[in-house]
A protein has these predicted regions:
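Domain-level marker for long, solvent-exposed, non-transmembrane regions
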Residues: 1-197
Length: 197
């Protein structure tokens, strides 16, 4: 789910979440029923809509949180980007061995001093319900222009972070480029973020 919690952690912390998967108000929708020829067994398939039904269980804000943006920087990039693409495809080494970025519904972006700059609370609830905080891709030439448009800001991660290896560390140049422009912050709030793995 995110850098601190798996699905199991969320359900352990809030056991009432399970109620959303049963009963008349279940977010699971029955999509297929088939009886065996001898009527001794029944196959039932359920569908779960990740957006908006499932994802809405894991955030509570209505408006995006805005802490300190935009950064004040004399070298502000005034380019009008249409999305943000961050390449995080490398294997990163540290004292505990090598690690690769793990997929997650919610990520955080940190600077090299592990100061947090971005998390799910900073994304609008409308964007989270529409398509989530971000999209992952293995395609370096990512082509979903609906998400990031034709002129995305392209950055390369310095490293990854978090208990579950889901968060991104950007160098100072990238942090300044991303967070010194209010248009870029709006792109993040709108979920126009793609991570290339």
């Amino acid at each position: 789910m995110d850098s601190e919690n798996t699905f199991k952690n969320y359900f352990d912390l809030n056991p009432s979440l399970i109620l959303n998967f049963s009963g008349p108000n279940s977010i699971l929708k029955r999509s297929y029923i088939k009886y065996s020829e001898d009527l001794r067994s029944l196959t039932v398939r359920y569908e779960l809509s990740l957006f908006p039904d499932f994802i809405s269980l894991f955030f509570s804000h209505e408006k995006p949180y805005k802490a300190f943006y935009p950064l004040v920087n004399s070298d502000v990039d005034k380019t009008d980007y249409t999305g943000v693409v961050i390449y995080v495809g490398d294997v990163y080494n540290n004292t505990f061995g090598s690690k690769k970025l793990e997929d997650s519904f919610f990520i955080k972006i940190y600077d090299e001093n592990i100061r947090p700059y971005f998390d799910k609370r900073m994304v609008s609830s409308e964007a989270l319900k529409k398509w989530g905080m971000l999209e992952y891709s293995n395609d370096v030439l990512y082509s979903n222009k609906n998400r990031v448009g034709y002129r995305p800001l392209k950055l390369v991660a310095k490293s990854i972070y978090g208990k579950n290896n889901t968060d991104i560390i950007l160098d100072e140049y990238s942090i300044n480029k991303l967070f010194s422009n209010s248009n870029n912050i709006k792109l993040l709030q709108d979920g126009k973020l793609v991570i290339i793995k």
